[in-house]
Amino acid sequence: MFTVSKKSLQASRNAFSPLNNSKRTIVFTAIAAFGDLLIGKDVRLADAMEKGNLHNKNGEYEHKMEQRTQERLNALRNTRPIEPNYEGHVPLWWYERMMLFGISGLKSYFHPENGENIVQLGEATALPCFLESLKRTMLLDKTGRRILQDRPNITSESLDMERLSKMDKNSVGYTYYKWLMKEGVSPDTRAPVTYIDDPVHAFIFKRYRQCHDFYHAINDLPIIIEGEIAVKAFEASNIGVPMAALGALLAPLRLKKVQKERLYSIYLPWAVKAGLNCKPLINVYWEEILDKDIDELRRELNVTPPPDLRKIRKERAKQRKQFKLKYETYEK
């Protein structure tokens, strides 16, 4: 028969006595406090981090973090040949510039549709001697000097596209606006200058880059490959841009036979002659002549647009279609 000893009974009574309950409460409280010390600290830390006020009152910590950030920036600067001279400037070592030229050149040849390749090649070939020559050209001209002084930035906002759309149909502004709409581009798509060291040179190259679409517009050349090559040749002969000269020489090599024939017989001869006869386009303050009559501007610049490339291509496509229909009819 099962029996309970007096000691077991007494232990059971003691376990449920008020004194022992009090002891258990103290023990559990101590465990909870210790757990809160270990775990609760992490919870409070996470809450403070989430609220963004973790170290708001700890000036020493903020100072240390700022110091570490500055050290990282200094370490990055120490890997560059010089300090950045303007916002967005990335100084390059000579071998990095050579690599940029080689890689961007190959990419531009095989993938001319990628604008980033063209942008990088342009800056890699923008030698200081060329930019200094362009600077002298601007300094010798009254308008060029004002452009260097004002440092204008061509954007949709600065040009006020809505105002351009309401200008006289034969004005420079409306001609530019109509060309942008026809080609589906915007002045805001021009990339900033990154790899040119001198701030003045960087501005000059940015100005050339931002004015590129005006050269298209006044000559009514589309942004298809033939139109781009023609404008590059025009730029090369007018202001001597090295990348433009390279593009005009090498880009036609990958074109179809009929495209080459058009370029070599019509557009490249026009581009060289027009560029040499035209006044330096880098000295044109486009923002100030938007109201001017486009024909009057062309006379002042001494430039005549080439034959309509879109029309020639369209007629060529029509002839091919007619020939194809005749051939199919003959086969039947």
UniProtKB/Swiss-Prot annotation:
The keyword Lyase applies. Pathway: Cofactor biosynthesis; ubiquinone biosynthesis. It is a peripheral membrane protein. Residues 1-16 form a transit peptide. InterPro entries: Coq4 (IPR007715), Coq4_euk (IPR027540). It is found in: Mitochondrion inner membrane. The keyword Transferase does not apply. It comes from the Eukaryota. Its main location: mitochondrion. Component of a multi-subunit COQ enzyme complex, composed of at least COQ3, COQ4, COQ5, COQ6, COQ7 and COQ9. This is Ubiquinone biosynthesis protein COQ4, mitochondrial. It comes from Kluyveromyces lactis (strain ATCC 8585 / CBS 2359 / DSM 70799 / NBRC 1267 / NRRL Y-1140 / WM37). The gene is COQ4.
